[in-house]
Regions:
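Transmembrane beta-strands of outer-membrane beta-barrel pores
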Residues: 30-36, 59-65, 86, 98-104, ...
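Residues that define the transmembrane beta-barrel architecture of outer-membrane proteins
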Residues: 37-41, 45, 74-80, 107-111, ...
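Cleavable N-terminal export/targeting peptides
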Residues: 1-25
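Transmembrane beta-barrel domains of outer membrane proteins
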Residues: 44-48, 81-85, 93, 114-118, ...
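Repeated loop/turn-to-beta-strand initiation elements of outer-membrane beta-barrel proteins
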Residues: 24-26, 51-57, 87-96, 121-127, ...
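Outer-membrane beta-barrel "beta-signal"
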Residues: 194, 198-200, 224-238
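Detector for outer-membrane/organellar transmembrane beta-barrel domains
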Residues: 91-92, 107-179
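Short glycine/proline- and aromatic-enriched beta-strand/turn motifs that initiate or cap beta-hairpins
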Residues: 19-69, 77
Length: 238
């Protein structure tokens, strides 16, 4: 976690400097997963610059969910993300980026590329491919020590309903590269997230989120449980 603390300090220094960035965004979110009976808390700071760069840092904390040796997940983590927007024209944008994830298990790197299209001033579509590579090894289904690497595809739809409300949908497909399985007993899993934001002021935006996480719930040694996530949060421009 030492690397995470160093990167966190660098990002916070950048966010706090008026010479580098105009204003950061703080996002505070809590959630509950029905299948795993798990509570989560997330704190996220992000900022975009006029030259095309964007960066974020977030910390996720979970309560002690269960004891399941089949699940290769850590309960607490920190991640740092950076990307760069390349404008192809007035409607199309390509964003190559990198997500670095730190947990008690080790470090995971997620290089990605995202393509977005502004269909109208209120409607945006996007697709993204990300490859999650783990710098550490874990026991696979054959008993060998390998890397639980994942191919990930995301689709995005964002619609500004009016000046007060914004709706977003994100659909995700995960596919494990090596001999591992998700809690649904498959090499692949899906997620769908639906978010509704309410813009109280230009600087304060509360939101609600519902996610269906396939049959990835794990509780008291049982897996392949239907998993629903209910979240509520608020973002502040600092």
């Amino acid at each position: 976690m030492k690397k995470a603390k160093i990167l966190s300090g660098v990002l916070l220094l950048c966010f706090s400097s008026p010479l580098i960035s105009k204003a950061a965004t703080l996002d505070v979110r809590g959630g509950y997963r029905s299948g795993s009976h798990a509570y989560e808390t997330r704190l996220k700071v992000s900022e975009g610059w006029q030259n095309g760069w964007w960066a974020s840092m977030e910390s996720n904390t979970w309560n002690t969910i269960h004891d399941n040796k089949k699940e290769n997940a850590a309960l607490n983590d920190v991640q740092v993300e950076v990307n760069y927007a390349i404008k192809l024209d007035d409607q199309w944008t390509v964003r190559p980026g990198m997500l670095t994830h730190f947990s008690s298990n080790g470090t995971r790197y997620g290089p990605y590329v995202k393509l977005s299209w502004d269909a109208t001033k209120d409607l945006n579509f996007g697709i993204r491919y990300r490859y999650d590579w783990k710098a550490y090894r874990q026991q696979d289904l054959s008993g060998d020590m390998s890397r639980d690497n994942v191919h990930r595809w995301d689709g995005y739809v964002t619609y500004h309903i009016n000046s007060d409300f914004t709706f977003a949908w994100q659909t995700t497909l995960y596919s494990k590269q090596n001999d591992y399985r998700y809690a649904n007993h498959k090499k692949w899993a899906t997620e769908n997230a639906f978010v509704l934001q309410y813009h109280i002021t230009p600087d304060i935006t509360p939101y609600i989120e519902y996610d269906y996480l396939d049959r990835q719930g794990v509780y008291n040694g049982r897996d392949n449980l239907s998993e629903n996530s209910y979240r509520i949060g608020v973002s502040f421009k600092l």
